[in-house]
Swiss-Prot record:
Keyword Cytoplasm: yes
UniProt keyword terms in alphabetical order: Activator, Cytoplasm, DNA-binding, Phosphoprotein, Transcription, Transcription regulation, Two-component regulatory system
Positions where 4-aspartylphosphate occurs in the chain: 53
One Gene Ontology MF term: transcription cis-regulatory region binding
UniProt-recorded name of the protein: Transcriptional regulatory protein WalR
Alphabetized CDD domains for the sequence: REC_OmpR_YycF-like (cd17614), trans_reg_C (cd00383)
Ranges where the Response regulatory domain occurs: 4-117
Gene Ontology cellular component annotations, sorted alphabetically: cytosol; protein-DNA complex
PANTHER family: PHOSPHATE REGULON TRANSCRIPTIONAL REGULATORY PROTEIN PHOB, REGULATOR OF RPOS
Amino acid sequence: MARKVVVVDDEKPIADILEFNLKKEGYEVFCAYDGNDAVDLIYDEEPDIVLLDIMLPGRDGMEVCREVRKKYEMPIIMLTAKDSEIDKVLGLELGADDYVTKPFSTRELIARVKANLRRHYSQPAQEVNDASNEITIKDIVIYPDAYSIKKRGDDIELTHREFELFHYLSKHMGQVMTREHLLQTVWGYDYFGDVRTVDVTIRRLREKIEDDPSHPEYIVTRRGVGYFLQQHE
């Protein structure tokens, strides 16, 4: 069954080019040209991945991303004409998985689509082998088989990538991991982003799992090196 892709771009010629090339690759493609229609289309079609322009009439891409993330966890690739660090970081903080700056190569974008689909929907063998092992860290319990986490009995809503990052750190408790290592291991060697992606995801995780994100007791920073998950008796 073909993977579904939703393309959201107010520039119809760009959307048409992406639709044509994605269909050539065997994907089922749906297009929207403004933010309001994009949300409706994503809710109706429940695609496997979304290509989302930031500058849109109606709701902008950031608002669409925020709204979609309330319900879905499919990969979202942000398309932007702004080569701005602020836009990239904000998009990642809202739950985007990747970003591409216009003008972009259609071949590169399709490669990113394939890479994001592969990372999101394929579990490494080692994850399957130990999936039944619950991990307890103080007040937090990780359920790898259900891709879920509870804190003091309450569910913590994590994105797919947030869960993978926290689960990976939990399996290497107390071991400092560099940003580069986490990017390669959790996001994959074919990920096109930079290490700032790790920082943004860590920040989102802390906001969800820490009682006081400014003074974390679970995910700790080793300044100048990376991050580790604090051991608790």
